[in-house]
Design a protein with these regions (language model features):
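Solvent-exposed, acidic/polar segments of extracytosolic/periplasmic ligand-binding ectodomains
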Residues: 31, 335-394
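Immediate post-signal peptide segment of exported/extracytoplasmic ligand-binding proteins
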Residues: 21-35, 63-69, 161-166
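Extracellular/periplasmic Venus flytrap/periplasmic-binding protein
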Residues: 86, 131-134, 139-240, 275-286
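Short, low-complexity disordered leader/linker segments with a strong preference
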Residues: 1-32, 390-394
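Beta-alpha junction/loop-to-helix N-cap segments that form part of ligand/metal-binding clefts
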Residues: 30, 45-50, 60, 64-133, ...
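Extracellular/periplasmic periplasmic-binding protein-like sensory domains
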Residues: 234-307, 318-324, 367, 373-394
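Periplasmic-binding protein-like
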Residues: 35, 91, 95-104, 124-126, ...
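Extracytoplasmic "Venus flytrap"
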Residues: 27, 31-53, 75-82, 104-105, ...
Length: 394
């Protein structure tokens, strides 16, 4: 009988040991992240801000995400959808990443959505947030730490409407985010749109468009020209003598990614954002100080949204205790968004896009000679995008 008890005890001990080994095998000691952004060409400054912001989050977390060593693999999508698709497939198939962070541009997002998410990998966008993926094409494995593309532009549309602008000239690049931008402005601006111009992505010479603006004599212009496009347009707009005659409204055209090149040409111009470097909370103060120390530049929305993407992933991994094998549990943890965002109040809507505040910001020159956008007025509070109602997720 004693032998039987001894055998049973041994088997029980073996079973416990086997279970412990299985648990160790399920819980890795590192997490692989694929970061894909635009790091070449005129828009590269946007990708650099995203990369820097995400890297700073990992550094603040001691090189770990959710207690797991963070292995961050970085790729340049070259602003080419086919290149992006190939690199995302390599992330998933070869590198077996658990999360993909990116991209900058909406045309790249549209290209990579299926290969990035169809096998259970989670895609976290620190910038691009198209209307289709917020609505009817929403995806359970896709989360956005930025905004729905229309929203920042709606800030300027509401401001223009409320401040008495009668005639506006609109311009944006000819791709989905550009169309979302102008539609967002028009959602709130009900005055006369004297012209609506779409230019090629990465256009740098605006002499023809500036002539159209001068001839149209609008009260205000509204433009969405990110990266190098915005740098050139702002300088050319100022040089053409239009800045003293026409109110300059924009989104992602005068921000911390472009101001080091635009400098005084952008002072006094308006933008619409979900955050600014002078937002008064302790986490923003630390982030801005540490970012400037590490990278020698003022962080903008691209950097902060990537930083929050890092905090989001960290919070999710912690909630599942490092076990990334249960995709449903990881998804639920991501949706909970249990972290302190740089923007303050933050939660996901049913479509995995944020509900958040938005501000009118104005370009200023700091006493130390650096340029930044500063909050002029809160326009929307706890603002949800209008496309969530079309998303099947609840």
């Amino acid at each position: 009988m004693n032998k039987l008890f001894a055998m049973a005890a041994a088997l029980a001990a073996f079973g416990f040991a086997a279970t412990a080994v299985e648990a160790q095998e399920k819980t890795p000691d590192k997490v692989k992240i694929g970061l894909i952004v635009t790091l070449s060409g005129p828009p590269a400054v946007l990708g650099h801000q995203i990369r820097n912001g995400f890297e700073l989050a990992v550094a603040h977390l001691g090189g770990k995400l959710g207690g797991l060593e963070a292995d961050v693999l970085v790729q340049d999508d070259e602003l080419k959808p086919d290149v992006a698709v190939n690199k995302v497939k390599a992330f998933v198939d070869r590198d077996q990443v658990s999360f993909i962070v990116g991209p900058v541009f909406s045309n790249i997002l549209q290209a990579i959505m299926k290969p990035a998410t169809e096998n259970g990998t989670f895609l976290i966008s620190p910038n691009a947030g198209t209307s289709s993926f917020a609505g009817k094409d929403c995806n359970a494995n896709f989360f956005v730490t930025s905004y729905q593309n229309n929203q920042a532009h709606e800030v300027l549309g509401k401001y223009a409407q409320d401040s008495g602008v009668k005639k506006a000239f609109l311009m944006a690049p000819n791709y989905q985010a550009g169309k979302d931008a102008l539609n967002g402005f028009k959602n709130y601006f009900k005055g006369d749109v004297v012209d609506e111009v779409y230019v090629p992505l990465n256009q740098l010479d605006y002499s023809a468009e500036l002539s159209k603006i001068a001839d149209a004599k609008p009260d205000a212009i509204f433009v969405f020209l990110p990266g190098g496009m915005g740098v050139n347009f702002v300088k050319q707009f100022r040089q053409a003598g239009l800045a003293d005659k026409i109110t300059f409204l924009s989104a992602f055209t005068v921000d911390e990614s472009t101001l080091p090149a635009q400098q005084d040409a952008a002072i006094g111009f308006f933008g619409g954002q979900n955050w600014a470097p002078n937002l008064d909370n302790p986490q923003t103060k630390k982030f801005v100080a540490d970012y400037e120390k590490a990278y020698g530049a003022v962080p903008g929305t691209y950097a902060f949204q990537a930083y929050d993407a890092g905090l989001l992933i960290d919070s999710a991994i912690r909630q599942v205790h490092g076990d990334l094998s249960d995709k449903d549990a990881v998804r639920a943890a991501l949706k909970k968004a249990d972290f302190t965002s740089l923007r303050g109040a933050f939660k996901f809507n049913t479509n995995h896009y944020p509900i958040q505040d938005f501000y009118l910001v104005k370009v200023a020159k700091r006493p130390d000679g650096k340029y930044e956008t500063e909050i002029a007025k809160k326009i929307f509070e706890n603002y949800a995008d209008p496309y969530a109602k079309d998303c099947a997720m609840k």
